[in-house]
């Protein structure tokens, strides 16, 4: 076990020198990005040793190195939990990040601040590793906030663009809503368990209150972009493509699902929170799939596919299968990073064109990118024997076996079919047909820093699911004993979506342009959610505050007290004065007649 913990600690500490190098020598040379890439590749190689030892021994470990602080009743220590989840995810995250770093050498070659960009990506990875290896809630919260702030910095990397700044602010604000739930959970456990160590929290709360679990679900919904807190995820595409690849594959967006996986010993005894997670995930996966159907930006399509897969992971949490959700996180990391890399390769070679309607014919001009895009899209759709199949098919089989509501299962199957449909649509628009770009361009697919990471991730997308399920079997995976028609449900849904997309694409080429129906606008405008939340509600609140200040203050109190009051007094005075006609004889006569009458009465 000493060897196991030593090699794991070496893996974690090998990522620190590139950060300290920037503090010692701020004027970094051009070799710094290569240094960071090599450090991550070395960390990945080292991490294979403790992961292999864990597979052989199967014994989880908790390393407690240093006591941070001690109050009267609470002790906080720096502790790492090296169990099935962290030891499996560590090499996956390092491998994917290594490939993304090498891809960034090609994609960001002309950026003057590429050294800082690589440093930010490395810190992003380190904060995610802190999150997955944390053994107490405070350490987990540090990693949680770390991925949040690094996502803000990386999404707004091109800070001169208004859209990039707006997207970064959206990401940080929506995540602050989720952080409210996390802090609520922290406070509840401190008050009731007097500890933030995970093993003590699980031991003392066999039947926990609904409140901390609701806080955890809110935190996960914010970080993993579930319905209601989802608009920041497609907006985050304003960042560079390597940022999108890292953000969506193995870091920030899966952090919320990973949080619920960590706390599954508490959730498995609480049916209401499981039902809530199931329904939330089912609605999210269907909504995101519907939105992806009509998007024309290639990165937005991949972003909504991420949101849909996160909903599927939430469904898996809801049917009490955390190991299955974790398996899908691991397989999803490979093909999602590959999808973004292929998108980045296409965008870069087509002079930053992202509209799939202006692409076409790339199958011959970019063969490796086209092959990789097809493989990753099929893995996303759950095509048999690709990496996504081993997790996605098992999720749907388990959901069909579980004693849960058929409504959630039905819309999950519909979302699976739609996933196949929008993946096929993207492939047909980008790779087949005639080139639709208005100007001739020079396509170069021969750079090794582009080809090598794509080849590595393509290999991962082909074989990772098989390797993980064969060599690292979790003890709680369900043994599915379903009838044949249920066994083929997921595959049938995938093939149905594929055929529908092919047929619709064939028909669309012969249709005349007409006014689209309202349902089309629901999909293209993302369910009108951004218009309502980001436009209508702020507009109504600003209008109400303007009317209050205008009607109550300016038009009522101020005018009644000052201008209108003075005006009314002056008007009445001037009216009184203006009634005087200046006829002095008549005035004296009117005075004299009453005087004479009075004298006569007296006498």
From Swiss-Prot:
Keyword check for rRNA-binding, yes or no: no
What is one process in the GO biological process aspect for this record? electron transport coupled proton transport
* Annotated GO MF terms: NADH dehydrogenase (ubiquinone) activity
Q: Which UniProt keyword terms apply here?
A: Electron transport, Membrane, Mitochondrion, Mitochondrion inner membrane, NAD, Respiratory chain, Translocase, Transmembrane, Transmembrane helix, Transport, Ubiquinone
- Pfam short name (any one): NADH5_C
Entry GO terms, CC = mitochondrial inner membrane
Q: What is its main location?
A: mitochondrion
- TM region(s), chain numbering: 4-24, 38-58, 89-109, 122-142, 171-191, 211-233, 241-261, 273-293, 301-320, 325-347, 366-386, 405-424, 457-477, 488-508, 537-557, 582-602
Q: Does the keyword Glycoprotein apply?
A: no
What the entry lists under InterPro entries is as follows: NADH_DH_su5_C, NADHpl_OxRdtase_5_subgr, ND/Mrp_TM, NU5C-like, Proton_antipo_N
Q: Which cysteines are joined by disulfide bonds?
A: none
Q: Tell me where in or outside the cell this protein is found.
A: Mitochondrion inner membrane
- Give the membrane topology, semicolon-separated if more than one: Multi-pass membrane protein
- Subunit architecture: Core subunit of respiratory chain NADH dehydrogenase (Complex I) which is composed of 45 different subunits.
Family to which the UniProt record says this protein belongs? Belongs to the complex I subunit 5 family.
What NCBIfam families does the record point to? NDH_I_L
Query: This chain belongs to which protein, by name?
Result: NADH-ubiquinone oxidoreductase chain 5
Origin species, per record, is Pongo pygmaeus (Bornean orangutan)
Q: Which gene encodes it?
A: MT-ND5
């Amino acid at each position: 076990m000493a060897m196991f913990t030593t090699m794991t600690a070496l893996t974690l500490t090998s990522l620190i020198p590139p950060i300290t190098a920037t503090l010692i020598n701020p004027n970094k040379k051009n070799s710094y990005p290569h240094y960071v890439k090599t450090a991550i590749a070395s960390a990945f190689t080292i991490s294979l040793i403790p992961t292999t030892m864990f597979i052989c021994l199967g014994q989880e470990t908790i390393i407690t190195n240093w006591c941070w602080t001690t109050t009267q009743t609470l002790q906080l220590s720096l502790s790492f939990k090296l169990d099935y989840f962290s030891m499996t995810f560590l090499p996956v995250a390092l491998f994917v990040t290594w490939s993304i770093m090498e891809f960034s050498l090609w994609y960001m070659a002309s950026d003057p601040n590429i050294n800082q960009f690589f440093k930010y990506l490395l810190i992003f990875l380190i904060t995610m590793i802190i999150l997955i290896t944390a053994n107490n809630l405070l350490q987990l919260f540090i990693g949680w906030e770390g991925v949040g702030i690094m996502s803000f910095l990386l999404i707004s990397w091109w800070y001169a663009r208004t859209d990039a700044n707006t997207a970064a602010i959206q990401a940080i604000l929506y995540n602050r809503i989720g952080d409210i739930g996390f802090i609520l959970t922290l406070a509840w456990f401190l008050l009731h368990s007097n500890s933030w160590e995970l093993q003590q929290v699980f031991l003392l709360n066999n039947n926990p209150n609904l409140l901390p679990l609701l806080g955890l679900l809110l935190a996960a919904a914010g970080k993993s972009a579930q319905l209601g807190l989802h608009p920041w995820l497609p907006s985050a595409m304003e960042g560079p493509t390597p940022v999108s690849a890292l953000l969506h594959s193995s870091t920030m967006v899966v952090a919320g699902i990973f949080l619920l996986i960590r706390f599954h010993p508490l959730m498995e005894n609480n049916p209401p929170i499981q039902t809530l997670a199931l329904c939330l995930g089912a609605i999210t996966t269907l909504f995101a799939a519907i939105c992806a159907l009509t998007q024309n930006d290639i990165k937005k399509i991949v972003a909504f596919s991420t949101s849909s897969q996160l909903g599927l992971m939430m469904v898996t949490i809801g049917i009490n299968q955390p190991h299955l959700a974790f398996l899908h996180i691991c397989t999803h990391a490979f093909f999602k990073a590959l999808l973004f890399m292929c998108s980045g390769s296409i965008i870069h070679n087509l002079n930053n064109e992202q509209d799939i309607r202006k692409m076409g014919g790339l199958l011959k001009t970019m063969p490796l990118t086209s092959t990789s895009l097809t493989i990753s899209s099929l893995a996303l759709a759950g095509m048999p024997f690709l990496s996504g199949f081993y997790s996605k098919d098992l999720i749907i089989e388990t959901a069909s076996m579980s004693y849960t509501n058929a409504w959630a299962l039905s819309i999950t199957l519909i979302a699976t079919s739609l996933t196949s449909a929008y993946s096929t649509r993207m492939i047909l628009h980008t790779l087949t047909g005639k080139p639709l770009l208005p100007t001739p361009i020079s396509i170069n697919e021969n750079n090794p820093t582009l080809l090598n990471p794509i080849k590595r991730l393509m290999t991962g997308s082909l074989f990772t699911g098989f390797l993980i399920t064969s060599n690292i079997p979790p003890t709680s995976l369900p043994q599915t004993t379903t009838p044949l028609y249920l066994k083929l449900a997921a595959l049938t849904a995938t093939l149905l979506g594929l055929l529908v997309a092919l047929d619709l694409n064939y028909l669309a080429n012969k249709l005349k342009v007409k006014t689209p129906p309202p349902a089309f606008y629901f999909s293209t405008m993302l369910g009108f959610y951004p218009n309502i939340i980001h436009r209508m509600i702020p507009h109504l609140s600003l209008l109400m505050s303007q009317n209050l200040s205008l009607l109550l203050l300016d038009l009522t109190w101020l005018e009644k007290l000052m201008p209108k009051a003075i005006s009314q007094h002056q008007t009445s005075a001037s009216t009184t004065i203006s009634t005087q006609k200046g006829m002095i004889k008549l005035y004296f006569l009117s005075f004299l007649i009453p005087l004479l009458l009075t004298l006569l009465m007296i006498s």
